[in-house]
Curated annotation (Swiss-Prot):
Protein name per Swiss-Prot or TrEMBL: Chaperone protein DnaK
PROSITE patterns xref list: HSP70_1, HSP70_2, HSP70_3
Compositionally biased intervals (Acidic residues): 599-608
Region (Disordered): 578-608
Role of this protein: Acts as a chaperone.
Family: Belongs to the heat shock protein 70 family.
Compositionally biased spans, kind Low complexity: 578-598
Organism whose genome encodes this protein: Streptococcus pyogenes serotype M2 (strain MGAS10270)
Gene3D superfamilies to which the protein is assigned, alphabetical: 1.20.1270.10, 3.30.420.40, Actin, Chain A, domain 4, Substrate Binding Domain Of DNAk, Chain A, domain 1
Molecular function GO labels: ATP binding; ATP-dependent protein folding chaperone; unfolded protein binding
Length: 608
């Protein structure tokens, strides 16, 4: 069975890992980095992903960041003169990860396990699967990020019984999961979180502070200047990282904008104390999900054996202190917060292929599922933190006499009223025989698969007629849209490959022209004019082809030049070899004469 890669598709950074033997290994990107920025840029028709895209974010307005925050919505992003769905942009990131994983493995990769925040709803999970499909990946499993982290942490501890709390603060989302590990079983007891809290929010607090201070001093609002804002974002992210290691950092942005008197510069120092003050409310928001998860799991703090930190934002000192204060435990530092999720995803890939044995992963659904019943009430069929996959049925009836049909309004959430929860979909069961209200028996069944994807069935127990849907949120993509996007992605891949081929050919032509001109100059007056003239003629023809830009002509003329240049090189080599031989012959004769003289002298010394 081919390898299944593990992908952590993050808000700010992504990572890819693969199982090698029993070890999960992070695959470095072409720039040698173990994580890749989740950034996509468009330039001159080319799609640029990762570090290169992030570097040009300041100057290139066609740059997309933090697309994960839009997954599962109908919101599109404009770039490159087009509109893209979040799934399409995410697919470009996935294609890039897939590409360098294939380069590392030396084989095609067609399957992946992709992680999502534990608190992702059905629409967001479906969007992630769709992105994988567009990227040419069969998504074998969608795994919750904290669960994947626990899997990576606990792989070498399958003989121990432990209860662990995973605190996962990423770039755009926050999750807390509590798991029980024992005899190779990873059982998720509870999960809680906040889909709108992450490292980006900490960056934003610094940006807001810098904008306010600059406006106070100069009367100019930098938030209205797109290029200045991007520079502020980069500076804020760097300052946040610096303050994890030092207590004060300098923010210096020369020529940030211009005033009536000329250019203006931003020079400010930011202390850790000030940063903590700016972000106090964000740190405070991490506490409620921790308490909620413990309550749902029915555990006290004293029953937690280990606390695992996941996500780059858990390096913020105030966050670490808050975790210590809330759990009463020193966090375990044995895992890399940036890499552990992708490593866990690769282990789950190994479980699927059978390369990892004696490991069972029991995940849960993060939010309750149910339907709207009379009076706009949300009636739950599956409670949050139910182990998946699962199935649950409940019998309902009609609300009016002779009601011919029932509308099934499928919802996800925790609020008591339907209007306050997330609509997953609607469908109708029709042709119900006329009967007084409360008589027809309508059985509604919810199924959640291993990926957390929901399907719902309604059945009239009297007529046995049923309706069945796999939930596709209004923001989801149709099969036709996914197919079109897959074709677009394939077409782009071909175009990118062709563009690279063109660049490689042009570079080869430049190199050949340079090398041949050098050789012709070096061989001037050395006697092989026929070969030199032939090489010069081929060189002139290649230069003309280069000028015209005709790729086929360039290819043909390059081959011709290589042939003539080779003939000239052979003559040069032959001449050099002959000269070397002649020189060695002269040295040999001289050595013989010298040896004869030495014999005479030695004879004199040996005479007694």
């Amino acid at each position: 069975m081919s390898k299944i890669i593990g992908i952590d598709l993050g808000t700010t950074n992504s990572a890819v890992a693969v199982l090698e033997g029993t070890e999960s290994k992070i695959i470095a990107n072409p720039e040698g980095n173990r994580t890749t920025p989740s950034v996509v840029s468009f330039k001159n028709g080319e799609i640029i992903v990762g570090d290169a895209a992030k570097r040009q974010a300041v100057t290139n307005p066609d740059t997309v960041i933090s697309i994960k925050s839009k997954m599962g919505t109908s919101e599109k992003v404009s770039a490159n003169g087009k509109e893209y769905t979040p799934q399409e942009i995410s697919a470009m990131i996935l294609q890039y990860l897939k590409g360098y994983a294939e380069d590392y493995l030396g084989e095609k990769v067609e399957k992946a396990v992709i992680t999502v925040p534990a608190y992702f709803n059905d629409a967001q999970r479906q969007a992630t699967k769709d992105a994988g499909k567009i990227a040419g990946l069969e998504v074998e499993r969608i795994v919750n990020e904290p669960t994947a982290a626990a899997l990576a942490y606990g792989m070498d501890k399958t003989d121990k019984d432990e209860k662990i709390l995973v605190f996962d603060l990423g770039g755009g989302t926050f999750d807390v999961s509590i798991l029980e590990l024992g005899d190779g079983v990873f059982d998720v007891l509870a999960t809680a979180g906040d889909n709108k809290l992450g490292g980006d929010d900490f960056d934003q607090k610094i940006i807001d502070f810098l904008v306010a201070e600059f406006k106070k001093e100069n009367g100019i609002d930098l938030s209205q200047d797109k290029m200045a804002l991007q520079r502020l974002k980069d500076a804020a992210e760097k300052a946040k990282k610096d303050l994890s290691g030092v207590t004060q950092t300098q923010i210096s942005l020369p020529f940030i904008t211009a005033g009536s008197a000329g250019p203006l510069h931003l020079e400010m120092s930011l202390s850790r104390a000030k940063f903590d003050d700016l972000t106090r409310d964000l740190v405070e928001r991490t506490k409620t999900p921790v308490r909620q998860a413990l309550s749902d799991a029915g555990l006290s703090l004293s029953e937690i054996d280990e606390v695992i930190l996941v996500g780059g934002s858990t390096r913020i000192p105030a966050v670490v202190e808050a975790v210590k204060a809330e759990t009463g435990k020193e966090p375990n530092k044995s895992v890399n917060p940036d890499e552990v999720v992708a490593m866990g995803a690769a282990i789950q890939g190994g479980v699927i292929t059978g390369d990892v044995k004696d490991v069972v992963l029991l995940d849960v659904t993060p939010l309750s599922l149910g339907i709207e019943t009379m009076g706009g009430v949300f009636t739950k069929l599956i409670d949050r933190n139910t182990t998946i996959p699962t199935s649950k049925s409940q019998v309902f009836s009609t609300a009016a006499d002779n009601q011919p049909a029932v509308d099934i309004h499928v919802l996800q959430g925790e609020r008591p009223m339907a209007a306050d929860n997330k609509t997953l979909g609607r469908f109708q069961l029709t042709d119900i025989p006329a009967a007084p209200r409360g008589i027809p028996q309508i059985e509604v069944t919810f199924d959640i698969d291993k990926n957390g994807i929901v399907s719902v069935k309604a059945k009239d127990l009297g007529t046995q007629k049923e309706q069945h849907i796999v939930i596709k949120s209004n923001d989801g993509l149709s099969e036709e849209e996914i197919d079109r996007m897959m074709k677009d992605a394939e077409a782009n891949a071909e175009a990118d490959a062709k563009r690279k081929e063109e660049v490689d050919l042009k570079n080869e032509v430049d190199q050949a022209i340079f090398a041949t001109e050098k050789t012709i100059k070096e061989t001037e007056g050395k006697g092989f004019d026929t070969e030199r003239d032939a090489a010069q003629s081929a060189l002139d023809e290649l230069k003309a082809a280069q000028e015209s830009g005709n790729l086929d002509d360039m290819k043909a003329k390059l081959e011709a030049l290589n042939e003539k240049a080779q003939a000239l090189a052979v003559k040069m080599y032959e001449q050099a070899a002959a000269a070397q031989q002649a020189a060695q012959g002269a040295e040999g004769a001289q050595a013989n004469d010298s040896a004869n003289n030495d014999d005479v002298v030695d004879g004199e010394f040996t005479e007694k």
